[in-house]
Amino acid sequence: PLPLDEARLSIEDGDTRIDRMILGAGTRVLTQMIPATKSAGVSLWVPVGSRDEGPRTAGSTHFLEHLLFKGTNKRSALDIAVAFDSVGGESNAETAREHTAYWARVRDADLDMAIETLADMVTDSRLDEDDFSMERGVILDELAMGEDSPTDTVHDAFQLAVHGDRPIGRP
């Protein structure tokens, strides 16, 4: 087992090295260097998902995930999209029952930009009322697509059967 309480940890296996650090506020940083690659990926995982929502706030985590791409106090939605598109990168996010993850893939030379942009989105987002209406439609479309997926339908039915109407049982 990994000594998860240590602030710094390194594991090496051939050319691959994984480092783990815990920053002052408890943020965990995992890095993996693979020398043969010229690309980089970064993910910011927030330990909040649909299981943390009550009946009145159901869906709010997914909604917030979408809204964080709408801009920050320093960047517009277009600035965020162009930051990744202009370097041939990509960014996206996902909301699950137990986490929300924001991620990007870029060339290794653009990693600092990706980290800075994602961190700005997560820590300094500008939530605008006009964006709520637009994203509501986008999310409803996503939910409808999920209903067309037999795998998603079965998974959601299983979670509901196992967990009942508790938050973790809801999609």
Regions found by a protein language model. Give the residues of each.
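Acidic/histidine-enriched segments that form metal/cofactor-coordinating
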Residues: 1-2, 6, 72-73, 79-171
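His/Glu-rich zincin catalytic helix
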Residues: 1-80, 106, 116
